[in-house]
């Protein structure tokens, strides 16, 4: 049975592996194994201390996670295991993000991640312009949801 709960330090390895697996499936041409040291450092020093993190688990197996910084409404990550795509996990995690930040959310979505763009549009996010992700350098769409 799927449960949502707050992230715990013991989830770190599973959360990082979930991120790697999911992004590798989304962008198979990129080497996410090579990015793991960078991601682990970012996870530990930026996301964990500054974000509310919710994980979705089924029988102890992480199927998704969401990070939102309540200070600036920035939804940094919604990650769902490829085998759980289309199962409602992303909707539940996004619902938690909206509960944590009821006044609104902002996110950068890679311009070529059409699946994610459709998902956010379906859930009330609107296009706010084009930009470049300051971390990856990839072109992104700024998207926002307001209550």
Name these PLM-found stretches.
Residues 51, 137-143:
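Short hydrophobic/aromatic beta-strand or adjacent loop that forms the aromatic wall/cage
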Residues 81-87, 111-112:
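Active-site acidic-Proline motif in GNAT/NAT acetyltransferases
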Residues 91-92, 112-129, 135-137:
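Conserved active-site alpha-helix within GNAT-family acetyltransferase domains
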Residues 100-112:
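Conserved GNAT acetyl-CoA-binding A-motif
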